[in-house]
């Protein structure tokens, strides 16, 4: 399996992280914490129901930094951003918990989820069942499995662990081979297509459009990365894609929730402006 260099470094660090964390909190203790966590909020169902109505099902991301862009947002208060997103019409939230490469934190997920009623995905690089159980203990409702970071056996193992603890799974692919592996290995309804090439970090919305015909109708295609303006949203919607994961476009805006409205619900922005007038 060829893994992109940046991803390879991140994955190697994740194995170290699991060893460090499980030395501090044992697997048995983590399982106990997971059992005591708030009930899952139904991440997949929320997206599916919204998309069925042909309404934008937006997973709004809370992300301070990235390896390719550095710090994206200086004024970073996860609870405030979460509330802004909920008011703006987000269906779900995505919170980065990776510390070393994205300046995320477990606490950010907890703070964001406590501030709203929306389901939340733990956005991190899952390589071990411990992290899945940890995600549930933190209160996450869904986890991300990145096909290019996992072999099929590990992918299936992580998905099985997620099911055991009541977590939904969003599987992420960025080419046809990965899509084939994901569909063969997992039965999750959520298939994310990352428009960012993990080898080059270049972004092309054609990635989603190219893979779309190969995604079965009983799965929900979610386009990730590169949605920056109304034209991008409309391009997806005319191709019957109503589920989006967007981070950077919102994080760079002064008011993330208002930017979400501008991109996905422009009619509501007009109404708000008229009310203010």
From Swiss-Prot:
Disulfide bonds: none
GO MF, any single term: indole-3-glycerol-phosphate synthase activity
Sections of the chain in a coiled coil: none
EC number: 4.1.1.48
PANTHER family hit by this protein: INDOLE-3-GLYCEROL-PHOSPHATE SYNTHASE (PTHR22854:SF2), TRYPTOPHAN BIOSYNTHESIS PROTEIN (PTHR22854)
Family: Belongs to the TrpC family.
Identification of the protein by name: Indole-3-glycerol phosphate synthase
Source species of the chain: Pseudomonas putida (strain W619)
